[in-house]
Amino acid sequence: MTKLKGKDMEKWMKCYVGTNSLRGSKGIYTLEINTQNGEMREASTVEADDSAYLYVSEKRKCLYAVMESLEYKGVPGGGVAAYRIEDNKLSFLNSRYAYGGWPCHVIADEEKDSLLVSVFRNGLLVVYGINQDGSIGEERRVEHHQEPNGRMSHIHASMPTPDGKYIAVADCGLDYIYLYDAKTYQKVFEWKAPEDSGPRQLRFSPDGKYLYMVSELSCQIFVFEYQPDCKDMLRNVQVISTRD
């Protein structure tokens, strides 16, 4: 969501809405919302298949969208697309194959010019480069997770740590949070969540000291102290039930 510039800056706010291609949805909608009276109007629409999760890069003035499908250009799996933000419309730049079905989360590591895509069905974390114009470059790494007992990994979210040293990954299938070295992509830490809790989303606090994890199945918020110089890199300090 971004604020409009000009004389209406205080009144209108721009936002982007991603949708699944069901019940007549066209794709990604650009909306303008009046922050004073709640009025909403559609500014533009770009056709896009199953582009439900979006990420806006303020640095590059680009929007990135996962393509939550099981087929990409005739190949099994989904994709990820890049769009240039131009006033009240989005202009398609390019798209890339996501190496698995149902990619569900995308975020940019702005400092490393990389794009992190979480692929739910196949348990993949795919890292792409970002080109100078904001388009998606070649993949740098494809990381796959699977337990020896046959349980399937379902990566639901990933994000860079505030210090840029690691990538935090939420595995909804195996009930883990992982930390990977952002340069070597080697796993350096793991935290086992309660069985069938379903880690889904991750966010760091503005000061970078805490990580928040939302569990989909147990309806809880887990709070961790992020301490990268300690053996226990993520220390669980609080659990909040959202059912209360």
Regions found by a protein language model. Give the residues of each.
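Beta-rich catalytic cores
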Residues: 24, 50-52, 102-104, 154, ...
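Surface loop/turn motifs at the tips and blade-to-blade linkers of beta-strand repeat domains
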Residues: 44-48, 95-99, 143-150, 191-195, ...
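Asp-box/WD-like beta-propeller blade repeats and closely related beta-sheet repeat scaffolds
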Residues: 91-157
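Short loop/turn segments immediately following beta-strands, especially the blade-tip
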Residues: 31-38, 83-89, 128-136, 181-185, ...
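Short glycine/acidic-enriched loop and turn motifs that connect beta-strands
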Residues: 21-24, 69-73, 121-124, 174-175, ...
